[in-house]
Regions:
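A membrane-pore/channel beta-structure motif
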Residues: 25-35, 65, 103-105, 128, ...
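Short glycine/proline- and aromatic-enriched beta-strand/turn motifs that initiate or cap beta-hairpins
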Residues: 20-77, 85-86, 173
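Gram-negative (and chloroplast) outer-membrane scaffold detector with strong preference
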Residues: 52-143
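Residues that define the transmembrane beta-barrel architecture of outer-membrane proteins
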Residues: 30-32, 41-45, 80-86, 105, ...
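Predominantly the C-terminal beta-signal and adjacent terminal strand-loop region
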Residues: 67-70, 139-174
Length: 174
């Protein structure tokens, strides 16, 4: 397992610099266009993507799904892998809360949902969520770091409410 992580880190170190855009305006306007990286959504943890579509944005995560019981969303979704998952959100992008020469502190809110399909049999997972996010949009690099509060309602494999849920994203913008 350790060798796999070493190869993954080497591959990431070689690929990420090739993906970083060389256009000057991409460094100063990280909220335009398309962002790609890693993150979590409603039930999904994996590859995160965000497409700006004014006045808002579509955000999605494709990755793995996990849960511990039939009580819906919760911290158990990060404990183990049960299958594959897709999370989709629509976010309303709001004006910056603060601006510095290094980053803009932006915020958004919206609604989303997620579907998880177990790979070893069992009941799929379905949940809906509200999203309220803080975005650190860096102005010297085409990066964003987003932290989201994400209260969710699990619909399958059982109805449950997760009022304390947080997710995060780290993306490169193109």
């Amino acid at each position: 397992m350790g060798r796999m992580w070493k190869y993954a880190l080497i591959l990431a170190a070689l690929v990420v610099p090739a993906l970083v855009p060389s256009r000057a305006n991409a460094w100063t306007h990280p909220r335009e266009g398309f962002g790609l990286g890693i993150g979590s959504g409603t039930g999904a943890t994996g590859i995160s993507a965000k497409m700006m579509v004014p006045p808002g944005a579509f955000q999605g995560v494709l990755g793995w799904w996990g849960h511990t019981d039939s009580n819906g969303p919760g911290t158990g979704q990060y404990g183990h892998i049960d299958g594959i998952a897709l999370s989709i959100d629509y976010l309303f992008e709001m004006p910056a809360l603060a601006t510095t020469q290094y980053f803009n502190l932006d915020w958004n809110f919206g609604l989303g949902g997620g579907v998880g399909v177990p790979t070893a049999g069992g009941t799929p997972g379905v949940a809906v969520a509200g999203v309220a996010g803080l975005e650190f949009n860096f102005t010297k690099l085409p990066l964003d770091l987003t932290i989201e509060y994400r209260p969710a309602v699990g619909l399958l494999p059982g109805v449950g409410i997760g009022l304390i849920g947080f997710t995060a994203h780290l993306r490169v913008w193109f």
